[in-house]
Amino acid sequence: MRMQRRHLLKNAAAALAALGLPALPQWALAAKAVGLRRLGQPQPFDYAWLKGRARELAKAPYKSHKQVLPGPLEALNWDQYQSIRYRQDHALWADGNGKFQAKFFHLGLYFHTPVHIYDIVDGKAQQLAYDPAAFDYGKSGLGGKQLPKDLGFAGFRLNTRKDTERDFSAFLGASYFRAVGKEGQYGQSARGLAIDTGTGGPEEFPDFIAYYLEQPAADSNTVVVYGLLDSPSIAGAYRFAITNGDVLLMDIDSALYPRKTIERLGIGPCTSMYQVGENDNRMDWDWRPEIHDTDGLAMWTGGGEWIWRPLCNPPHVRFNMFVDENPRGFGLLQRDRNFDHYQDDGVFYEKRPCLWVEPKSGWGKGSVQLVEIPTVDETFDNIVAFWNPQAKPQPGQELLMGYRLYWGAQPPASAPLAHCVATRTGLGGIVGQKRSHFSWRFAVDFAGGELAALAKDPKAKVEAVLQVSRGTTEIVSARPLHELKGYRAMFDLVPPDEGTQQIDIRLYLRANGKPLTETWLYQWTPLAASERKN
């Protein structure tokens, strides 16, 4: 479906907070497992069949899957919807001896598109029936007798048998899904696809309309989930192999079948929130120093360069394209892990997971694209990053894309070079001296690699290599920062005029002609002339 992105994402972000709801009472957790009601007869199933189903779906005209919900569900407010919980005694696989269980989300509030959910056992799939008795309706005011027996589900969540109170992955709303590492704290989301994100026109949000959950073997650490995706522009078949661990791994295969030419197709989209950080938008009205799920976009290019692009909460929608060929990986990371930098003991931003996208094969020519949208609300996901193939998919074409998603405190791959640990900005000039002109100060801290040893060497000649697309730089330096066992690069940027046209900045440290750090990229919007201080 197509709709205004701000409306959908704000609702989705708030609703996904339901993933952290308190558990059911202990009597429900301890109840004997109840067999789930099923529909029809088991049918042979494999990924090839699902790809065929998606291919046939794409050949037919699109029909919306959204439905009008019964009045009581339409009328739910957030607190009422939040109180509806799936009963532990009805969990899928609760009566088995495997390591995992699945529970389901109820339709209502923002979720009007029912998804069909199937259980796969011994290569055969059978649809699970919606059962009002499987839900505790809490303070919603609803009861099973008010709802139809064929209502359907909104999505599902996965948990381990050892910890039924906390889920480690959840699929809910459009094509959104989330996961956590050992920190157990949800943060950013992924999506099956992004369509026409940042084009200036309406964005299309595909829906997963069916999920097929394969019963894991008793000793397996992996849950395999299949998804059927549909939208006005495309249909697709997905296979997720989800391996729980300190860093949760999703091994994903997708087969995409366009109905029409897509202007901007986003593969492996990451969706996050950045409101305020060390580098911009200090807010006098909020008591917390920083508010963000992630603080930067990391890229490992096909040519082997490591790039770090700090995120911003821009004054207007900002779109960046990083052209590449066969990228080795990219992702939105939360590098700042210091509680003191956030001071939020309710949502714990310092525990939010990084999300790293690793192609399983060559993706060819294209670009990593970053969209940053202004926000004054931390419940609005305003950051999106994805891979956009250079060749636009055409109707009748099959596009096969395989990749891995890693969710955890650290990405699986990192540069052998030093990496950026902080970016700070403010008014430039020399303290104590009258400013003759306006300039903006940048202080960029690097740590790791060879920097700790070089910081102790008085003969080391470390220099900042700096480029800007407009304006001039002054007071450029690179000096040891012993508190970090690293270096701080510092410079002032003087805009060329009184305009607010963006300026691109590129920086890294080197010694003896050899790079010492990853490449730091930044896009700065100069202050309006009326806001500048000399």
UniProtKB/Swiss-Prot annotation:
It holds the Pfam family MdoG. Belongs to the OpgD/OpgG family. Pathway: Glycan metabolism; osmoregulated periplasmic glucan (OPG) biosynthesis. Probably involved in the control of the structural glucose backbone of osmoregulated periplasmic glucans (OPGs). It comes from the Bacteria. Transmembrane segments: none annotated. PANTHER family: GLUCANS BIOSYNTHESIS PROTEIN, GLUCANS BIOSYNTHESIS PROTEIN D. This is Glucans biosynthesis protein D. InterPro entries: Gal_mutarotase_sf_dom, GH-type_carb-bd, Glucan_biosyn_MdoD, Glucan_biosyn_MdoG/MdoD, Glucan_biosyn_MdoG_C, Ig-like_fold, Ig_E-set, TAT_signal. It is found in: Periplasm. Disulfide bonds: none annotated. Keywords: Periplasm, Signal. Residues 1-30 form the signal peptide. The keyword Zinc does not apply. One of its GO terms (cellular component) is outer membrane-bounded periplasmic space. Gene3D superfamilies: 2.70.98.10, Immunoglobulins (2.60.40.10). Its main location: periplasm. GO terms for biological process: beta-glucan biosynthetic process. One of its GO terms (molecular function) is carbohydrate binding. Predicted to be exported by the Tat system. The position of the signal peptide cleavage has not been experimentally proven.
